[in-house]
Amino acid sequence: MLKKISNGCVHIVQRYLPDPFIFCIILTIVVFIAAIPAAGATPLQVVGFWGTSIWSLLAFSMQMALVLVLGTAMATAPPVKRLLDKIAGVAKTPFSAIVLVTVVGTVASWLNWGFGLVVGALLAKSIAKKVKGVDYRLLIASAYSGFVVWHAGLSGSIPLTITEVTEAVTAATGGALTESIGMDRTVLSPWNLIACLIILILMPLLNAKMHPAANEVVTVDPKLLVEEEVTVRKASTPAEKLEDCKPLSWLVVIIGVVYLVQYFAAAGNPLNALNLNIVNLIFLVLGVLLNGTPLNYVKAVNDAVKGAGGIVLQFPFYAGIMGIMTGAVTEGGPSLAGVISNFFVAISNDITFPLFTFLSAGIVNFFVPSGGGQWAVQAPIVLPATIKMGLDPAVSCMAISWGDAWTNLLQPFWALPALGIAGLGARDIMGFCVVDLILSGIIVCVTFVVVGLI
């Protein structure tokens, strides 16, 4: 039964889901039309929302491109290849291969979302070389499916933001949040950890059960996954000797390590100090170290850059979509995202409020696939309503966080780094991800219903 459902989803997605760039354009058209009545804007004003926002994610786009490039350059270094091969060697059958890559991807995403996006896909590639008969599409989908827990993990941007309430945080929540909320009430709360644990147990089993029959498996030739061996040349000129000079790489590593030690020492709690820039710096330092010589690292980066085209092209369009979603004719006026959030707030009561906050966040995330954007859109609506109803703001913040992560399983935006590493397209994995979306959605919905009853 499960295989019939998953096969049906895969068939539908492969038939009807276009290239992610076309998907961007279609989403832009949909939100453009919807924003006119929702925000009370003219078409020219909506064009203005789009145009003033299209370049608003340039820094973030570069960060995401670096997650892919630096993570790949590090993970393709000879020592890391050997480590991944050893881990991949644990899997002997397609079932164990899918379970292993899902567990690793989920745990890695909970620890840090940038790390999780990269390590799961790279492990999946290593497993594909070793395990015969495993479906490559499902391997990559399984690696990505663990990303659903990222915003309920240690690098979740919303839980980290509210650990220190600044004037900006108070303003972003419409004046509702005036006291800090520790991680013990959000990410490390018992109910959140239980939800993550249930997903960690059930998601690998679900993914493994979705594995197609032998006659329907889509495999990849292991030869296509083998990178060219690095040839050791004999440097004959001063320039070549500099390019192969390991001490130059060591100097970069020393500087980077010293800074990281200072940074984490000053931060107090290392886990709370992790952010995208620090993750990228760690990838950079490790990549330079593990590739040996400066020129080897340059070659590794050049190879990795080839997979970053989708990020470079599509992220500006999602920034434009976010601009349309959040755009208002007057300051504090209605916006399309606000209308969606307000609707769910209006139909909620004390018990269903966390559930409907989660569902509304999932819908908004489909058009605003950014934790920061999600917070900017929903916090001014959800948090004042939370305080007015006498509910726990920590639960509301986590409901937004879970919704933000949940529909990433159906949103190609965040899958781009993993797809770039794997050499696949969105339609190759999204059919499987639809089933994962349903399972994780049920788990989280039940969680918030229970939390609402407590």
Which residue stretches match the model-derived regions?
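Transmembrane alpha-helical segments of multi-pass membrane transport proteins and ion-pumping complexes
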Residues: 36, 60, 64, 72-77, ...
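Hydrophobic alpha-helical transmembrane segments of multi-pass integral membrane proteins
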Residues: 90-123, 315-329, 338-384, 388-389
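Flexible loop linkers connecting adjacent transmembrane helices
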Residues: 5-9, 42-50, 75-91, 124-136, ...
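Hydrophobic transmembrane alpha-helices of multi-pass small-molecule transporters
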Residues: 1-69, 188-201, 205-314, 435-438, ...
